Amino acid sequence: MNILSLGEKIKKLRKEKNMTLKELAGDRITAAQISHIERDKSHTSRELLEYLASQLDVSVDYLLETKEMQSKKLTDNLILQGEILIKCNDLEKAEDQLNEAIKICDEYKVLDNYATCNFLLADINFKKGKYSESVMGYEKALYYFIKNNDKDKLYKCYLNIGKIYMIEEFYKGAILQFEFSEGILNEIQVEDVDIYKDLYSKMAYCYIKLDNNEKSLDYINKMDE
């Protein structure tokens, strides 16, 4: 799917139908006016758009769809494909899809999807054992998730960074990330106790590794509450 301006769409459709400028213009406007529209040098009225849409056998909504709207739709689709490929463990193809989506998001400022792409690429790098790249991806995503107040994604970012720090035996850093995760869980009032238990077990483990048995016991007790 190419991302096209209004003029580019009209020109592409006209060429596909082998219509000349004069044929598309008909008795409604001049060929010169159509040429201006195709070069995005002229504004069009709703009435004229309805005429052009009928001549080109498309909807007015299609013609009115902006580059930003098209880029959102295209990156939504690439992200969905990427998520499916990750679930199928086809990580290389998933990475290709998401990198393509990131380029489009960056060019057209589709910030929500830009954050999601970075999050999913971080997941891929986590699975590959590329921990530094993974943390960088989660941190990029965090910036936008914080701006959008996306609590669910924030929780997952902090949790996964904490898991990576555990693997790397950076236990103080892991605890800090898990504390951020715990704060979000409390804020959104998650009812699934198993989510809390899983988090508390990780925190207890980190405190044991830091020889802080008292804090470790606190979190072990929390698991039984």
Where are these regions (language model features)?
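Residue register of alpha-helical TPR repeats
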Residues: 76, 116, 156, 194-198
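Amphipathic alpha-helical segments of tetratricopeptide repeats
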Residues: 99-106, 139-149, 179-189, 221-225
